Amino acid sequence: MRRPLLCLAAWLYTACILPAQETASVRLADGFGIPVGLDGSKKYYKARGFRPNGHLGEDWNGAGGGDTDLGDPVYCTANGLVVYARDYRAGWGNVVIVRHAFSEKGDIRYVDSLYGHLDRILVKEGQRLERGHKLGTIGTGHGRYPAHLHFEIRKDIRVGMFRSMFPRDFRTYFDPTQFILARQSLGGGERTVSVPINTFPNEQGFAEAEKYATENRAGGDRTSPVRTNGKRMMFEGGMRWSADTGQVHSDSAPSKPKRSFQVDRYEDLRSR
């Protein structure tokens, strides 16, 4: 029963993609970097890493823990084009997605970087950014979490905010740290290329597909909170997530680091 439901939801998703391929120009990425701590004035740590079929990005926290990093700058990981900059609410809060083009093995490839739970958005959709551009500030997802940055790098540029319609593994996502470590310095940064745009579902298709999936869950999946061992939990697509903290994370909050380190240069990660 579940497969036909997913197929129909996928059809709804596909049907709401703009049929004509639109493009915009952007500078090739000359390298990718960590999105926090660029000025070296504060230390950060990775509180939660990428886990296929689980946590689909990385959570970066200030070394002081708690909300000590609230309002700290968030920087664009590479040259790119802002394709999403809105308050998505739910478990996300303010979100920015930037589309990047880079040269690898003679081919032009595309990825999206996502910056979630922002306190402030400082860029607009359609804006072209350079690596290190301040695009927002670290937030709490409207008070849902201790302040931190949720950071993703996606190889599938159709996802947008509709993650439930795509594989939750390496077919869709990169491990952000591994991706950046392998691409800190790239050639072609002065070259301008075209990138696909408007690859996400439009708002109507978004709502229709999500409404269908919500109303037709099979196998006991739920989209309203239930109690499990005294905790409010949600079930979506066979996965459990906390109704109190939102669908991005498990119900565990980021922990204090065992040690902290400067992250303005990614070489620091290699020696630790």
Residues covered by each model-derived region:
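Bacterial N-terminal signal peptides
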Residues: 7-15
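A broad detector of the eukaryotic-type serine/threonine protein kinase catalytic domain
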Residues: 65, 120-123, 134
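Zn2+-dependent peptidoglycan hydrolase active-site motif and core
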Residues: 69-71, 77-122, 147-152
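Surface-exposed, glycine-biased beta-strand/turn segments
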Residues: 18-94, 131, 140, 174-271
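Conserved, short, structured surface segments that act as functional micro-motifs
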Residues: 94-100, 127-190
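Sterically constrained small-residue positions within well-ordered secondary structures
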Residues: 11, 49-51, 89, 106, ...
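Positively charged n-region of N-terminal signal peptides that target proteins for export
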Residues: 1-4
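Short, functionally important structural connectors and interaction interfaces within domains
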Residues: 9-10, 66, 110
